[in-house]
Design a protein with these regions (language model features):
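Conserved phosphotransfer cores of two-component systems
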Residues: 50-53, 77-82
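C-terminal output helix
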Residues: 18, 112-121
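Conserved phosphotransfer microenvironments
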Residues: 20, 55-77
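Alpha4 helix (beta4-alpha4-beta5 surface) of REC/receiver domains from two-component response regulators
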Residues: 91-107
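Two-component signal transduction core modules
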Residues: 58, 107-108
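Short hydrophobic/Thr-rich beta-strand motif most characteristic of the beta2 strand and flanking loop
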Residues: 27-40
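Acidic, metal-coordinating helix/loop segments flanking the phosphotransfer/catalytic sites
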Residues: 38-57
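Conserved acidic segment of CheY-like receiver
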Residues: 3-24, 58
Length: 133
């Protein structure tokens, strides 16, 4: 089985590490292993996508600066044909409306709960419909 291609975006290396640790080498036992692609800047992420990369899931930090993951999520959904599912990480539960605006399929809040993140990611990789947390 081919590895699941997962993009992780955050300007904060500790946030990227938390996300990657939560995902582990395989998000769930019924899914293939992960291949993680880390990005600290929106321009690097867009160059990767524009280069024709096949991606199964985007996990984007909405608290990144100067370019937040919510805006990038919206741009991906607007510009990428058959865009992969997007999971955004917001600063607080009350920001769920921003996650909805971004057209992300799912959202979780900081601080990252590894179990919630892994479950949401697994559901999206399986093609399940997920709502904001």
């Amino acid at each position: 089985m081919a590895k699941k291609q997962i993009v992780v975006y955050s300007d904060d290396s500790s946030t990227r590490t938390s996300i990657i640790n939560a995902l582990g080498g395989r998000v769930a036992s019924d899914l293939p292993e992960n291949q993680i692609h880390e990005f600290a800047t929106g321009s690097a992420l867009r160059a990767f996508v524009d280069g024709g990369a096949v991606i199964d899931l985007f996990i984007l930090d909405g608290e990144s600066a100067p370019e937040g993951g919510l805006g990038i999520a919206r741009q991906l959904k607007d510009e990428v044909f058959n865009c992969a599912p997007v999971l955004v990480i917001t600063g607080r539960k009350e920001d769920a409306w921003l996650a909805a605006w971004s057209m992300a399929e799912s959202s979780v809040v900081h601080p990252i709960d590894p179990f919630t993140l892994a479950k949401s990611a697994a559901d999206l990789l399986r093609g399940a419909s997920v709502t904001a947390v």
